[in-house]
């Protein structure tokens, strides 16, 4: 049996870096790992209605002037499109605001500038509430920022989520994979490989299929490889999606 190596962990010395960058006392190490897990979990809960999150980077500075640990949290997420913003804001209105006025929603739909401002206000509100909750729970200083990704087809995680959404809508997996590859071809990336595993198209026997376009040199340490593993929950069961992107050599 062949043994697979994680493409990003294999290149931590050369082209990749850890998503959590900090050093800690060995007695505090488990609690810090748990804190990182809770931060990422709360971010998924707080921003899932508005953003498609790619990754969350956590950087700790040991001490500041007030002898408190300072934690920088950077959220890498897709910049929301107008239609998606309206749909997600409307969902937020109906779920969180009582007696939401349909005229307000139609005004947001017709005025993109107002919609963007309202979305940014909601994001800032969520950032403030999340920062306050983390400060109360852990007693540390937190700085949360959002780094928007303009093109979702330059990020492996967002491509995997896109394919997963298509599969959950019962789109044939070959069509979803071909659409993703065609959109990646419009970018400056050198190559892409996509693997889909599970009960594809509802067939009882599970299998794996993959498709590649361009070069994806997984054995070259200089290669800048972006990797993501996602899952889609369909009516036939869980389907696994793996995406490799090759952006060039350093």
Task: Describe the role of every protein-language-model region.
Residues 1-250:
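Ribosome-associated RNA-binding proteins
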């Amino acid at each position: 049996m062949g043994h697979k190596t994680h493409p990003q962990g294999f290149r931590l010395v050369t082209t990749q870096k850890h998503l959590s960058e900090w050093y800690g006392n060995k007695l505090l190490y488990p609690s810090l790992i748990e804190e990182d897990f809770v931060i990422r979990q709360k971010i998924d809960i707080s921003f899932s209605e508005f953003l498609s999150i790619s990754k969350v980077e956590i950087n700790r500075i040991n001490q500041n002037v007030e002898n408190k640990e300072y934690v920088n949290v950077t959220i890498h997420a897709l910049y929301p499109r107008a239609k998606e913003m309206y749909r997600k804001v409307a969902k937020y209105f109906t779920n969180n605001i009582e007696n939401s006025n349909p005229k307000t929603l139609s005004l947001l739909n017709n005025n993109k500038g107002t919609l963007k401002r309202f979305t940014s206000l909601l994001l800032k509100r969520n950032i403030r509430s999340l920062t306050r909750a983390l400060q109360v729970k852990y007693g540390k200083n937190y700085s949360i920022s959002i780094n928007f990704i303009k093109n979702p087809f330059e990020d492996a995680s967002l491509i995997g989520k896109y394919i997963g959404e298509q599969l959950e809508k019962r789109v044939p997996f070959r069509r979803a994979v071909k659409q993703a590859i065609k959109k990646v071809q419009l970018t400056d990336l050198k190559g892409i490989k996509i693997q889909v595993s599970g009960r594809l198209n509802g067939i009882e026997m599970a299998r794996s299929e993959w498709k590649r376009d361009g070069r994806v040199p997984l054995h070259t340490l200089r290669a800048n490889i972006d990797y993501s593993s996602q899952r889609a929950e369909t009516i036939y069961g869980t389907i696994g999606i793996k995406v490799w992107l090759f952006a060039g050599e350093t």
